[in-house]
């Protein structure tokens, strides 16, 4: 099912990287990387990719047939008790004579630290290495199939944002706004959407929608809509102004939009992300918002809403170079205005030869 040859080619590219680094095999337990190599998001994933030869997938006994059909991987080994899963993986490593084994060190659903620690205890003869950078070396640059899915996810973001704007009214709770967006997106085919809502004067970044925080007249409402299609995400943020707009809020919005354009213009192949960040910091300081800005203007988008490069929480990623085929969300970091709320406008872009092409489409100036 899906695109078996596409996923086999990804496995082969990864195997070449493993061989170059002297790694005998890699165990994939992160949901997004399992999907990258198999085309399937399957809970409790376990995939063993040797540097040479066919991959092995480990599945719950009664799921094995469907896993084989959906992934196209013929070597499916089963378990019924959790201990049998570890025994099966350890046995495959011993049988393969693997001495150096990679793990995807990532904080993600189903990437269990307990499994990792138990693996090291059971397989003391094995040297364990982090293969997350190798996987993301592949995942950061999208192919045409991935970009097409992200384009379709972008259209869903627009539908979700329209539902959010319609729902924003004085007295409505953040949770009620989010509920309308979730309903719209899931009815449209988004399986795992994410929605964040911050109604001023509350100041929260990446705000989980709260039932007791309500939209108030005269304050901004910032809405983040992340929709997925075919497993791939697009990410969009807009700020809705409710009632009369204060001069301070309007000025902050105008400055943020200037920064949004500056970042968009800076996302060209060959650009170092930190250099764009410096330009943004200079602008915010010149305009009087140096103490209101948050460092980290962009992040990757793909099988995760936020994936490498993540310039907010992983400082080394700020040294990464923009490449053609990357998909990035910008301007990610908001302006936080105590007593007013949060100002943020964010879009998803694909990097082409001549610069960033915006994929998410929705108007910027939103007033209710």
State where each predicted segment sits.
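Active-site neighborhoods and metal-handling regions in enzymes and metal-associated proteins
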Residues: 1-368
